[in-house]
């Protein structure tokens, strides 16, 4: 059931009596372009995750990323926001840094994308909200995905299949 409706600026009552906020659909490129400008001013910008490429760490329409312009050298394991040559905006993790550019992958992926130029990368993710809990660098899950999960890209399918089997 699609609960999206025209934004009236006030919550609406659903049939179940639960108050819901109206959702406005906007063009993704336009929306992210505005957020990018804010991040490039040095502000931290929150954004709801859309898509499943960063699963199992981040889940579609549940978790949030918080990003800002990078103030340091980018390195393997960093989550970054970038714009592909096609104009599509993507948030993935740096798999490898080489002289010719940056190589990226999502946490749910085994394919490596790249090389990307440094100027395509406009933001560094500095914290996330996962299942309602804020996770920052230094926290267990942040460090696990940044340092361990990024190193097992070829084995990810087997690891996630085993996890699903054991659940």
Summary of predicted features, one role per range:
Residues 2-4, 9-167:
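Extended hydrophobic leader/signal-anchor segments used for secretion and membrane insertion
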């Amino acid at each position: 059931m699609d609960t999206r409706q025209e934004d009236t600026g006030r919550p609406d009552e659903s049939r179940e009596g639960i108050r819901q906020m109206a959702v406005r659909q906007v063009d993704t490129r336009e929306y992210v372009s505005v957020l990018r400008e804010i991040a490039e001013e040095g502000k931290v910008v929150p954004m709801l995750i859309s898509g499943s490429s960063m699963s199992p760490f981040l889940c579609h329409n549940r978790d949030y990323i918080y990003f800002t312009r990078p103030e340091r050298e980018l390195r393997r394991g960093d989550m970054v926001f970038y714009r592909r040559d096609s104009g599509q905006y993507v948030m993935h993790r740096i798999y490898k840094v080489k002289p010719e550019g940056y190589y990226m992958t999502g946490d749910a992926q085994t394919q490596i994308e790249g090389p990307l130029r440094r100027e395509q990368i406009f933001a560094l993710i500095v914290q996330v909200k996962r299942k309602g809990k804020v996770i920052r660098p230094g926290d267990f899950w942040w460090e696990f995905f940044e340092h361990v999960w990024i190193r097992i890209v070829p084995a990810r399918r087997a690891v996630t299949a085993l996890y699903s089997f054991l659940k």
